[in-house]
Amino acid sequence: MAGATVTVEEVRKAQRATGPATVLAIGTATPANCVHQADYPDYYFRITKSEHMTELKEKFKRMCDKSQIRKRYMHLTEEYLAENPNMCAYMAPSLDARQDIVVVEVPKLGKAAAQKAIKEWGQPKSKITHLVFCTTSGVDMPGADYQLTKMLGLRPSVNRLMMYQQGCFAGGTVLRVAKDLAENNRGARVLVVCSEITAVTFRGPSESHLDSMVGQALFGDGAAAVIVGADPDERVERPLFQLVSASQRILPDSEGAIDGHLREVGLTFHLLKDVPGLISKNIERALEEAFKPLGITDYNSIFWVAHPGGPAILDQVEAKVGLEKERMRATRHVLSEYGNMSSACVLFILDEMRKRSAEDGQTTTGEGFDWGVLFGFGPGLTVETVVLHSVPITTGAAITA
């Protein structure tokens, strides 16, 4: 038998990219229905027929007042909820009605975000080699990844990965996965989509489940998409952020801190421990592991993209690390204008950061800083840590069309 003409090592080398994975475009989308936080307690208790629960309504109003959220977007309209009263009850069987919404609307909202990212990228859809789709909203077969592939007209040979029921940390997870795909497949262009709709978690209030009410005060709907690829062709592609390293960790002594369970009543949400305290207690270790190899110990000298699980998390992280308030500006802006959109949040923050950096005349997409960190926090407690490197801003760059 004739000897092989190439070695495995040569094949492996040819398969791999040379440079780091890079974010090449970002797109975001929300439902049209906008809910202002100041009006939400009255609306929420009226639509769930809970106005007789006056003390609970006052508690909920205080939650909303402290949330630092100005407005959110929600697919569920008052008209739809009026037609589906079981979704408004605290624990009424309603999974079928919820599923009917999310299996259609999750890929549809994802499509809107993906189209914006593809338009900014400016390359033919046929160049997309991989699709990573993430949602905590509903499960179906074939999944939202398949539906989006059909909706966008992607090649039938696109390599798909569907991630269901990950939770709020997954905006970091999808970037970690996309980094590995882009760097280990020369020429790969990965479309990443996070699409979240609260139709699975919406329900009426209960004195016995106040942590569910916390979710009702915080969560909103949104989708975000990014194009990730290594070795960008800068004649036609515009790098935004490089993905330098990525890791995932389960925090010690945090089991049960955040749980979600899919039941006949929908997705139930449970906060069982001091989540802000657990995250802030472990944040320095995560930062040291990520930035010590780079010789960075001043965390005010990097840009910050942190999942805004709630204002208390951001407050305690700031205090623990000694952050200047300006470091969390992009994060707090997204919390204020959209609420907690689970996995999509950190991608919204990346979008806000690169746009504001250009508008403010900064030298880089990372608010003038070279290095940055992206944190995802969620069920587990699980933390995703992504080290980012910004790129220089040229005239007209870093702002979407």
From Swiss-Prot:
InterPro entries: Chalcone/stilbene_synt_C, Chalcone/stilbene_synt_N, Chalcone/stilbene_synthase_AS, Polyketide_synthase_type-III, Thiolase-like
Organism of derivation: Sorghum bicolor
Disulfide bonds: none
Function: The primary product of this enzyme is 4,2',4',6'-tetrahydroxychalcone (also termed naringenin-chalcone or chalcone) which can under specific conditions spontaneously isomerize into naringenin.
GO molecular function: naringenin-chalcone synthase activity
Active site residues of this protein: C168
Taxonomic lineage: Eukaryota, Viridiplantae, Streptophyta, Embryophyta, Tracheophyta
EC numbers: 2.3.1.74
GO biological process, one term: flavonoid biosynthetic process
Keyword Membrane: no
Pathway(s): Secondary metabolite biosynthesis; flavonoid biosynthesis
Name of the protein this chain belongs to: Chalcone synthase 1
Pfam families with a match to the protein in the record: Chal_sti_synt_C (PF02797), Chal_sti_synt_N (PF00195)
